[in-house]
Amino acid sequence: MLENSLILGAYLFCLGIYGLTTSRNMIRALMCLELMLNGVNINLVAFSSFLDPDKIRGQVFAIFIIAIAAAEAAIGLAIILNIFRNRNSIRIDQFNLLKW
């Protein structure tokens, strides 16, 4: 059971990294970042249940990470929406708001 969970978590994390490095769309990049966090959560819960099945520290920490990821997604989507209103594009290569 541990091996399957670790393989699934690593697969999700690698898929997120691949999508983050190849994506030109900000929303797709944000979704890939969330995918990476979900892969980390799966590995965290798998290790927690394997090492100490009586305590739920890993599960509590995973729920905390999910809450932080939800806040990060809301803030990220608000920033992307603001950029789209100003630039009419959400492509990462056209994102140069911080340049003089």
Swiss-Prot record:
InterPro entries: NADH_UbQ_OxRdtase_chain4L/K (IPR001133), NUOK/Mnh_C1-like (IPR039428). The chain crosses the membrane at residues 1-21, 30-50, 60-80. GO terms for biological process: ATP synthesis coupled electron transport; photosynthesis, light reaction. One of its GO terms (molecular function) is quinone binding. It catalyses: a plastoquinone + NADH + (n+1) H(+)(in) = a plastoquinol + NAD(+) + n H(+)(out); a plastoquinone + NADPH + (n+1) H(+)(in) = a plastoquinol + NADP(+) + n H(+)(out). HAMAP family: NDH1_NuoK (MF_01456). This is NAD(P)H-quinone oxidoreductase subunit 4L, chloroplastic. It comes from Staurastrum punctulatum. The gene is ndhE.
